Amino acid sequence: MNKIIKSIEDAQLKSEVSKFHVGDTVKVYAKVKEGNRERTQVFEGVVLKRQNGGARETFTVRKQSNGVGVEKTWPVHSPIVEKVEVVRLGKVRRAKLTYLRDRVGKKAKVKELVR
C-alpha cells in the first residue's frame, strides 16, 4: 500500500522547488484569482516553520502589516505558489520559530547569516 501512495505523491511533486530554510526572509509569489482575472500577489516575511515532507510539505511565513502580525501557510508543491525567492538568509537555532509571535519590534528580528 505504501508503494502505491508513494508513486502517486511522486507524480504530484514539483520538479523545481526553491531552497529555503526556517528563519530566511522570503518573497512568496502566489497566484490569486479574483473573478475572471488572475494575478500574482507577493507576500514577504520570515519562514516560521516547515512541516511534513513529500507532497504534503507546507511552510508558514509571517510578516507585520500595519502593526498586525499576518501568517500564511502554503503547500510547497502547490500550483498556486509560482516561486519562492530568498531575500535574506537567517541564522536560527530552532526548527520552529513560533516564539516570534509574541515578540514586537527589534526583538522579532532574525540574525542574518553571512556566507
Curated annotation (Swiss-Prot):
Gene3D superfamilies: 2.30.30.790. It comes from the Bacteria. GO terms for molecular function: structural constituent of ribosome. One of its GO terms (cellular component) is cytosolic large ribosomal subunit. Pfam families: Ribosomal_L19. GO terms for biological process: translation. Keywords: Ribonucleoprotein, Ribosomal protein. This protein is located at the 30S-50S ribosomal subunit interface and may play a role in the structure and function of the aminoacyl-tRNA binding site. Belongs to the bacterial ribosomal protein bL19 family. NCBIfam families: rplS_bact (TIGR01024). This is Large ribosomal subunit protein bL19. It comes from Lachnoclostridium phytofermentans (strain ATCC 700394 / DSM 18823 / ISDg) (Clostridium phytofermentans).
